[in-house]
């Protein structure tokens, strides 16, 4: 390796002449790896007083030698790239109480430009003009000699760049040029700085740290060495066969290895919103959906277990279980042997699904209330004879209900004069989610008398031009419409007989379907 005079100078520093004298004596120094200036003149002796006993040792010198034998390459990028191997040294012989400044610079090793061909480096021309030399000052500087000698001095944060306009203080290098790193130990002056003519310093050079700057690795051997030794290059390594073998030997019968996919399936099934008490709790979150069964979950009767209620309830709450179970079974694709037509069911049969009246409960299950809301169209009857076959109760489910036209598409059989009974369009139809809360809010907002169901019923039966009103108490079924009402007063026609037996309905507690109107309104 050729070492030129300008290669080992400290450019743009006031001690440039002393650096040249240091480089001239370094060629005569038989010891490789360390360079120290001997006093040759009174001025030089004064400058270097107290710096003679300093020794520097390169850390991981064997690794550096491996790279040096092949031809060390260092990547340079526009943003800056760190060196590997990192430049780390061990310093001895410093005055423990004196403050020192440690810094590095990287200078051209020769005036040649290189190329890599035929698995070797060769000179291809004259070197480009060197960039202005930059000094990298160690972040701990200035510090006492005791601090520097206590541990390794690492310059791993130093970065190399090929951006000539780099504003971050990185070392600027040219690609395909050879460079030599140098370490400088400078005794700090009274201002904790350096640069004056009387500044004492020493420079240490390790030839095995020389490298060629490249934008991408040229020698595949260097690439392999960096992958094998750089802990940050583990992403380029393959799977470690020895590690897999060691893990396979650690497996035993007592602790079998379970695939992660199986664990995820078990966890998702345990926390499914359709199993156990989690399913009951999740029904409240489905209030915003149109129907709870539209999520497309199909299950068999063996998979549907009774929901576990964390609160103790009385026996009269059994309809919560039945309605929830029935709704899950309606979502099933299997045929049930106990299906019964809706119109053929008699009130004498003890079927919990068709009981005419239930004790009024404040905390009804969400699925029960939603199912009741889905059947509200059955309660709007008219005197027109049914032309189509009446569907069964099991057919009126979440899967077939969208075929029923909404209120917005229903035709009006007859219209009362505007002064007697103005047409009130029913704003909340069945496709807008749960019906019960919206009807209550509309009724309470329109007429304050709707809140009391008993007084409402008594008042509306005395008015001859009121729509049909359904009312039920805790111990009574659904009331039939008054006989004084005419068929023309029914606003909606669905082809269902007017007089239906009470057992064909679910009871809805305290809900006025149409706001109250009077002659004076």
Swiss-Prot record:
GO terms for molecular function: DNA binding; DNA-binding transcription factor activity; DNA-binding transcription factor activity, RNA polymerase II-specific; LIM domain binding; protein-folding chaperone binding; RNA polymerase II cis-regulatory region sequence-specific DNA binding; scaffold protein binding; sequence-specific DNA binding. One of its GO terms (cellular component) is actin cytoskeleton. Keywords: Cytoplasm, DNA-binding, Nucleus, Transcription, Transcription regulation. PROSITE patterns: TBOX_1, TBOX_2, TBOX_3. Residues 17-28 have a biased composition (Basic and acidic residues). Its main location: nucleus. Residues 63-238 bind DNA. It comes from the Eukaryota. SMART domains: TBOX. GO terms for biological process: animal organ development; cardiac left ventricle formation; cell fate specification; cell-cell signaling; embryonic forelimb morphogenesis; embryonic limb morphogenesis; heart development; hindlimb morphogenesis. Residues 1-45, 254-281, 332-352 are annotated as: Disordered. Residues 31-45, 262-281 have a biased composition (Polar residues). It is found in: Nucleus; Cytoplasm. The T-Box domain binds to double-stranded DNA. DNA-binding protein that regulates the transcription of several genes and is involved in heart development and limb pattern formation. May bind to the core DNA motif of promoters. Monomer. Homodimer (via the T-box); binds DNA as homodimer. This is T-box transcription factor TBX5. It comes from Gallus gallus. The lineage of its organism: Eukaryota, Metazoa, Chordata, Craniata, Vertebrata.
């Amino acid at each position: 390796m050729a070492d030129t005079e300008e290669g080992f100078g400290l450019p743009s520093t006031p001690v440039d002449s002393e650096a040249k004298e240091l480089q001239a004596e370094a060629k005569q120094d038989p010891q490789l790896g360390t360079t120290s200036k001997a006093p040759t003149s009174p001025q030089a002796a004064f400058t270097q007083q107290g710096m003679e006993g300093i020794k520097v040792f390169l850390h991981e010198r064997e690794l550096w030698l491996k790279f040096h034998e092949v031809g060390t390459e260092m990547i340079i990028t526009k943003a800056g790239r760190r060196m590997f191997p990192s430049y780390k040294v061990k310093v001895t012989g410093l005055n423990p109480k004196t403050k020192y400044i440690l810094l590095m610079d990287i200078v051209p090793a020769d005036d040649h430009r290189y190329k890599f061909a035929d698995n070797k480096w060769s000179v291809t021309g004259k070197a480009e003009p060197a960039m202005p030399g930059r000094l990298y000052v160690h972040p701990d500087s200035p510090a006492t000699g005791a601090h520097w000698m206590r541990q390794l001095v690492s310059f791993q944060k130093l970065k190399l760049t090929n951006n000539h306009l780099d504003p971050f203080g990185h070392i600027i290098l040219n690609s395909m040029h050879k460079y030599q790193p140098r370490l400088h130990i400078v005794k700090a002056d009274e201002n904790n700085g350096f640069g004056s003519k009387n500044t004492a310093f020493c420079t240490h050079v390790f030839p095995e740290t020389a490298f060629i700057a490249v934008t991408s690795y040229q020698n595949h051997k260097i690439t392999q060495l960096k992958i094998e030794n750089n802990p940050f290059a583990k992403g380029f390594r393959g799977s470690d066969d020895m590690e897999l073998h060691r893990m396979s030997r650690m497996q035993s019968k007592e602790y079998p290895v379970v695939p992660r996919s199986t664990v995820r399936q078990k966890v998702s099934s345990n926390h499914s919103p359709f199993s156990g008490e989690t399913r009951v709790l999740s029904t409240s979150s489905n209030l915003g959906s149109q129907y709870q069964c539209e999520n497309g979950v199909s299950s068999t009767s063996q998979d549907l277990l009774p929901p576990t209620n964390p609160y103790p309830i009385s026996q009269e709450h059994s309809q919560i279980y039945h309605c929830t179970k029935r709704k899950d079974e309606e979502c099933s694709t299997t045929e049930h042997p106990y299906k019964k037509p809706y119109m053929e069911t008699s009130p004498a049969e003890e079927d919990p699904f068709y009981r005419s009246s239930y004790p009024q409960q404040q905390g009804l299950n969400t699925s029960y209330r939603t199912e009741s809301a889905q059947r509200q169209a059955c309660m709007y009857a008219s005197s027109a004879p049914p032309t189509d076959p009446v569907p069964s109760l099991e057919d009126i489910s979440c899967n077939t209900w969208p075929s029923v036209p909404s209120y917005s598409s229903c035709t009006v059989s007859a219209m009362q004069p505007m002064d007697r009974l103005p047409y009130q369009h029913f704003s909340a139809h069945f496709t807008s989610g749960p019906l019960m809360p919206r009807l209550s809010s509309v009724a309470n907002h329109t007429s304050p008398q709707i809140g009391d169901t008993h007084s409402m019923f008594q008042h509306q039966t005395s008015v001859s031009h009121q729509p049909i009103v359904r009312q039920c108490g805790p111990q009574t079924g659904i009331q039939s419409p008054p006989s004084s009402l005419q068929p023309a007063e029914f606003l909606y026609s669905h082809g269902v007989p007017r007089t239906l037996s009470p057992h064909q309905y679910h009871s809805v507690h305290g809900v006025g379907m149409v706001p109250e109107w009077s002659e004076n309104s």
